[in-house]
């Protein structure tokens, strides 16, 4: 993968950061849900008693769906954790503020107004931040790690 493609992917991660946090909460809620299955839910007399009863276990389709959700959950958790740790590698305070604002989903204009500087300055800072993260991703082989979750998403 070229540096530009990695940069686009990192920008997408940053843009989707809040979405990933919400999806992690939802997936945790779905995967940790406990279903209480009561016994004797089928009839014991009459025509219904002769009908086949449903299985109390989990079907193969449900297990595959749970596996896909778990892989997606682990992938999103890994990305969110990586983006959170990327803040530690940003040295300049202004760059940290821009990165934090980007993670919040703020636009160039909103960040520029917040820092009282031009959008072009924000674009240059963002490019420097993304370049720094691209180098860290390449050093850590993070994309290869994420490819193990690729089939889930």
Curated annotation (Swiss-Prot):
InterPro entries: RNA_pol_sigma_r3/r4-like, WH-like_DNA-bd_sf. It comes from the Bacteria. This is Uncharacterized protein YjcO. It comes from Bacillus subtilis (strain 168). The gene is yjcO.
């Amino acid at each position: 993968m070229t540096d530009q493609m990695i940069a686009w992917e990192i920008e997408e991660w940053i843009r989707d950061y809040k979405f990933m946090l919400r999806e992690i909460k939802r997936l945790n809620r779905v995967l940790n849900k406990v279903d209480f299955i009561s016994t004797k839910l089928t009839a014991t007399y009459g025509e219904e008693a002769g009908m086949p009863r449903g299985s109390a276990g989990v079907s193969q389709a449900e297990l595959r769906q749970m596996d896909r959700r778990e892989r997606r959950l682990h992938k999103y958790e890994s990305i969110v954790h990586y983006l959170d740790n990327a803040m530690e590698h940003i040295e300049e305070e202004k760059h940290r503020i821009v990165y934090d604002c980007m993670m919040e989903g703020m636009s160039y204009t909103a960040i520029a107004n917040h820092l009282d500087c031009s959008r072009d300055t924000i674009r240059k800072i963002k490019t420097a931040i993304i370049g720094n993260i691209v180098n860290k991703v390449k050093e850590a082989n993070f994309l290869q790690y994420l490819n193990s979750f690729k089939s889930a998403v």
